[in-house]
From Swiss-Prot:
One of its GO terms (cellular component) is extracellular region. It comes from Spinacia oleracea. The lineage of its organism: Eukaryota, Viridiplantae, Streptophyta, Embryophyta, Tracheophyta. The keyword Disulfide bond applies. Antimicrobial peptide. Active against Fusarium spp., Gram-positive and Gram-negative bacterial pathogens. Distributed in the epidermal cell layer of leaves and in the subepidermal layer region of stems. Not in roots. GO terms for biological process: defense response to bacterium; defense response to fungus; killing of cells of another organism. Keywords: Antibiotic, Antimicrobial, Cell wall, Disulfide bond, Fungicide, Plant defense, Secreted. Disulfide bonds join 8-52, 19-39, 25-46, 29-48. This is Defensin D2. It is found in: Secreted, Cell wall. Its main location: secreted. InterPro entries: Defensin_plant, Scorpion_toxin-like, Scorpion_toxin-like_sf. The keyword Disulfide bond applies. Belongs to the DEFL family. Group IV subfamily.
Length: 52
């Protein structure tokens, strides 16, 4: 991982639809000001990560 500390995850506000590619989600999260993002869970939601 990028961070050695714990990561807090927040659903992306700008990402629409089913998250199939981590790179697309990561781009949306960076646009929102987060350092990273990836697809998570059964429902494939775009989750943005930041150090807690």
């Amino acid at each position: 991982g990028i961070f050695s500390s714990r990561k807090c995850k927040t659903p992306s506000k700008t990402f629409k639809g089913i998250c199939t590619r981590d790179s697309n989600c990561d781009t949306s999260c960076r646009y929102e000001g987060y350092p990273a993002g990836d697809c998570k869970g059964i429902r494939r939601r775009c989750m943005c990560s930041k150090p807690c």
